[in-house]
């Protein structure tokens, strides 16, 4: 499935229906008077957050959305029907911005959340509305009001419990594939992962969602590489798993590079709870493993987890560590 996390959309609510000019026509009633009904309201444009979506790709193929015009008023004081609404269905985690792509309109953070982006125009008054003591038979009615027209931006920030960060080839996609049913593309070259992947991990009968984003390189916060574009997807996570490949010559430098990029990006990423793990340890002998684990522990200030997604070594411990932080964060949110 293709991934799209930002797109521009054009929306227009429906125009109001016109009021009717009509007069009562009945046998034996010579001066029946006006009976033109009001026009119906135009349809609204709504946005709704739904489960089962994790990309905005559908909006690549349709960018224009217009609600229906209200039905015109009719004789016998009949009001026109309201125009049909249009609903944009977006993934949970989608933010809606004004045309400047900076002013936030609404953040769709819960399944079923709905928000009206544009209200339909009011229907026009029929001529019955204008009857007065000085004008018993008005021969005019109002047209309906025009609907709203605007350009908006949709920006997706995936909602996951844990986020995987690290340099390209740190083993993030292999980790995700080993502990979830997600099947990201895996190969031994940088930037194999070109867009975020989500997976559901289960440990001790408890589930949580993991997001894997493309690898970060030095200068990522300034737009170097592709990882910076997707850092927003781990802003909402409760914990980061920072993977450092055992194949790196200098594991301390690799750790510090990513740490610096997270700090430079901002968005609260540098303050987020972080678990550091030395990954791909199956490629090292015992002596090399001890040396690199010691160097990484010195750089990050705590002994790193030692894992291999290929042999499954350390995977259970890593998942339990993530689950523990997530559970503590959720408990804190509930108390607040």
Swiss-Prot record:
CDD domains: Obg (cd01898)
OBG-type G domain segment(s): 160-327
Cofactors that this protein relies on: Mg(2+)
Binding site for Mg(2+): 173, 193
InterPro entries per the UniProt record, alphabetical: G_OBG, GTP-bd, GTP-bd_Obg/CgtA, GTP1-OBG_CS, GTP1_OBG_dom, GTP1_OBG_dom_sf, OBG_GTPase, P-loop_NTPase
GO molecular function, one term: GTP binding
Residues covered by the Obg domain: 1-159
One Pfam family from the record: GTP1_OBG
GO CC entries: cytoplasm
Xref: PROSITE patterns: G_OBG (PS51710), GTP1_OBG (PS00905), OBG (PS51883)
Cellular localization per UniProt: Cytoplasm
Residues the record lists as binding GTP: 166-173, 191-195, 212-215, 279-282, 308-310
Keywords attached to this entry: Cytoplasm, GTP-binding, Hydrolase, Magnesium, Metal-binding, Nucleotide-binding
First-level EC class: hydrolase
Function: An essential GTPase which binds GTP, GDP and possibly (p)ppGpp with moderate affinity, with high nucleotide exchange rates and a fairly low GTP hydrolysis rate. Plays a role in control of the cell cycle, stress response, ribosome biogenesis and in those bacteria that undergo differentiation, in morphogenesis control.
Record family assignment: Belongs to the TRAFAC class OBG-HflX-like GTPase superfamily. OBG GTPase family.
Subunit structure: Monomer.
Protein name: GTPase Obg
Classification lineage: Bacteria, Pseudomonadati, Pseudomonadota, Alphaproteobacteria, Hyphomicrobiales
